[in-house]
Amino acid sequence: MVRKFDFLVIGSGIAGMSFALKVAHKGKVALICKAGLEEANTYFAQGGIASVTNLKVDNFEKHIEDTMIAGDWISDRAAVEKVVREAPAQIEELIKWGVDFDKNEDGEFDLHKEGGHSEFRILHHKDNTGAEIQTSLIETVKAHPKITVFTNHYAVEIITQHHLGIIVTRYTQGIKCYGAYILDEKTGEVDTFLSKVTVKATGGCEAVYRQTTNPLVATGDGIAMVYRAKGVVKDMEFIQFHPTALYHPGDRPSYLITEAMRGYGGILKTKDGKEFMQKYDPRLSLAPRDIVARAIDNEMKLRGEDHVYLDVTHKDPEETKKHFPNIYKKCLSIGIDITKDYIPVAPAAHYMCGGIKVDLDGQSSIGRLYAIGECSCTGLHGGNRLASNSLIEAVVYADAAAKHALSVLERYDYNADIPEWNAEGTMNPEALVLITQSMKEVNQIMEAYVGIVRSNIRLIRAWNRLDILYEAPARLFKRCKASRELCELRNMINIGYLITRQAMERKESRGLHYTIDYPHADKK
């Protein structure tokens, strides 16, 4: 089946839904969601969204400086200035769409402070800001007559000249995107979605790691598809490991203990109740995430333990319950009263700072294709993302991409020559077993060899094992009917390869990329 839309938005988190709402008055929008609308990464973001709002003590220059420091001075300054200066207007837009940020007794925003921030500037809704934003946007999107939501639809490939029989390489000029082939999981058929403009808002890729705070749908689909289509992908070595995921064996994904809990006064301690962050950074538990994650990783290895602890027992119990009601309930459900007990925590893969390279308008290297949100690489994060800068980046770049797309929409039309998907092939139980086991192997490889601390030997081993793993799904994809499981495996191996290759290419330790073979930053 062939479907035609002015705008094809693949991904339904804060970035995808914001873009859809900003362009829907000018054309028909298809919003593709690989699972349910609530399963986007946005829904699971706890801490909040960063923006300068209290001008009595804060200003843009401070937020810019904090972002550059966290990014280890390799962030794109233009991207940083854009996001920081345009943030307040996008906060107003979110409020207009129904998002309810917490206020204090004076009616002003109740601001949190998180690691790496010099001021209180984190807007939040209790300790489930992402869920509040996602729920508000879902209601607004569903009410819009020009936005059609396709749940349980999975993007298999973006459509370029390659599908017209033209050879496309990484040196081909003028690659263009004409839409995407989308698998309807209900029917098992792959439909052809033609569009004038296509937007990737597919989120992150942290499900390639065994320990992750991300929903397991975060398999890097958008990044992998654009890479295979010969688009530019950048900074994949910079995987952020959140320092404080709840340690509870068997949980996958891991439950996130928000950064805001350390901003609130939480202290990292060893099993015997001793503080340790003073050995690593003068900012103690409020140091940027890469420093805290490496410190925890080192303490765990020194002691042969699986976790450390976060202590908020010295804080007022009622205040703790008020600020962190969901964390309180979650921990209580496994027998931990955070007002009396230490919280067991360990690092887990949390955020991809790199992705599909885009310009200040969110345009990728492929014409008519934009990338926004976590799947994109705007340059904002550099070597490490500052806490709570991701949600604001998503809405600022959704706005930029929407404005640019609307300004060029009339130049584009549908490409009527695109062939429909070749649906031949079968899927047998043996193939499904192979896929499931291969996914587990990818998780094990990435966790063991491409984690918080890396080395040349570990990276080479990961490369070789991923290379072996790639052959089977590549053959299966040619002879089997397309399925979500097979496509996800192929994407996960592509993502593992990209992270490993770009980590091997960076001959220094910088931001989130730390290698024992090159322990210092190259200051050239």
Task: Specify the residue positions occupied by each region the protein language model found.
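Glycine- and aromatic-enriched mobile tails/lids
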Residues: M1-D6, K22, G36-E38, F44-A45, ...
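N-terminal Rossmann-like FAD-binding beta1-loop-alpha1 element of flavoenzymes
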Residues: F7-L31
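Conserved N-terminal glycine-rich FAD pyrophosphate-binding loop of Rossmann-like flavoproteins
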Residues: A35-M68, D72, Q240, D251-Y255
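Rossmann-like flavin
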Residues: A70-D110
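Short beta-strand to alpha-helix junction loop
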Residues: S75-P88, R121-E139, F150, T212-G220, ...
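Conserved redox-cofactor binding core of oxidoreductases
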Residues: I95-E189, L194, A201, A245-H248
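FAD-site-proximal beta/loop scaffold in flavoenzymes
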Residues: E157-T169, Y178-T187, I336-L380
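An anion/pyrophosphate-binding glycine-rich loop and adjacent beta-alpha core
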Residues: M225, G231-I338, I343, V395, ...
